[in-house]
């Protein structure tokens, strides 16, 4: 499942570049696939694993519609290939994290990101067997049955594509020993809120991967402003998020508008600082810190 998401991301990455190449030279598609496979699967210890990874990547690019293992295997030799690929995805010993990091690093080298975007990923399911399936009343989706996750998107001027994701596991799964055992949920995985899941998804990427530290756009409901924003502040990562109109903030930088205004809403701070607004583009600097020009240093009041 994790590999499926990675393949979808790679498909987005390859799309425009490869479509242009294929229009002129059909054989460039496979050459580009091999080139990207060498980058993505370099962490695989065995040659046969790297080869299967390349075949899976090529099959996912050729498959139209739903990219299930069965549909992908149809381009690789039918039922025998399906069984082999199913084992490779579900039961092999390779680690998926280096694959995701390799994708994000490769993209960053091609074109540095402007931001990392966290976005909800609802996955409708009819049955009960998929890990994390639950039925909830969602304020946006209404009554929803399925899995809930958060994706982390690489966002540049020319391309937006997912590079990682984190599955939300409800308490009904984590407190059920039978479900935990059947789904092979690690012992160290504990309960978290949807908000915590969204934050952890992107901080795990920026805290452990070799990717540029860019501002985070957090497209998720933020209810615990002090806790959530505090995590980004401690990590030194600017964040853009929606907050309620009753939440109050304090401007910390004495040189910025609103510093002497006490506790203000986000809208009041934005109005006071409207003279500082400017269109942001990529710079030559390797990182974006909390003290960057044009960045408001604010913190929620407690």
Regions found by a protein language model. Give the residues of each.
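Conserved short loop/turn motifs at secondary-structure junctions
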Residues: 57-58, 88-91, 214-221
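Short, glycine/acidic-rich beta->alpha junctions
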Residues: 64, 99, 144, 220-224, ...
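Short, well-ordered, mixed-charge alpha-helical segments that flank or form enzyme active sites
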Residues: 125-127, 160-161, 171-176, 223-227, ...
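Electropositive, glycine- and tryptophan-enriched low-complexity nucleic-acid-binding patches
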Residues: 83-87, 140-212
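Gly/serine-rich nucleotide phosphate-binding loop at the start of the catalytic core
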Residues: 2-87
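Electropositive nucleic-acid engagement tracts
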Residues: 48-49, 60, 64-128, 240, ...
């Amino acid at each position: 499942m994790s590999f499926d998401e990675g393949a979808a991301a790679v498909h987005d990455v390859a799309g425009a570049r490869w479509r242009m190449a294929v229009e002129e030279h059909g054989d460039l598609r496979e050459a580009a696939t091999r080139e990207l496979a060498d980058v993505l699967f370099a962490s695989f210890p065995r040659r046969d694993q790297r080869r299967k990874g390349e075949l899976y990547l090529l099959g996912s690019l050729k498959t139209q519609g739903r990219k299930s293992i069965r549909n992908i295997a149809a381009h690789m030799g039918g039922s025998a290939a399906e069984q082999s690929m199913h084992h490779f995805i579900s039961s092999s010993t390779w680690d998926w994290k280096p694959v995701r990091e390799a994708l994000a690093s490769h993209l960053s080298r091609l074109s540095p990101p402007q931001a990392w975007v966290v976005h909800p990923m609802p996955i409708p399911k009819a049955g009960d067997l998929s890990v994390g399936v639950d039925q909830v009343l969602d304020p946006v989706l209404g009554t929803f049955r399925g899995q809930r996750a958060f994706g982390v998107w690489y966002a540049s001027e020319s391309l937006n594509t997912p590079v990682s994701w984190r599955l939300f596991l409800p308490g009904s799964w984590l407190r059920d020993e039978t479900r935990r055992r059947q789904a092979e949920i690690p012992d160290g995985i504990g309960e978290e809120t949807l908000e915590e899941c969204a934050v952890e998804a992107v901080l795990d990427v920026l805290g452990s991967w070799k990717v540029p530290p860019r501002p985070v756009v957090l497209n998720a409901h933020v209810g615990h402003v002090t806790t959530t924003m505090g995590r980004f502040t401690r990590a030194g990562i600017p964040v853009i998020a929606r907050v309620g109109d009753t939440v109050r903030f304090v401007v910390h930088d004495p040189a910025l508008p609103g510093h002497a205004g006490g506790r203000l809403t986000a809208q009041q701070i934005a109005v006071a600082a409207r003279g500082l607004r400017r269109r942001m583009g990529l710079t030559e600097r390797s990182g974006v810190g909390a003290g960057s020009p044009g960045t408001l240093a604010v913190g929620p009041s407690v």
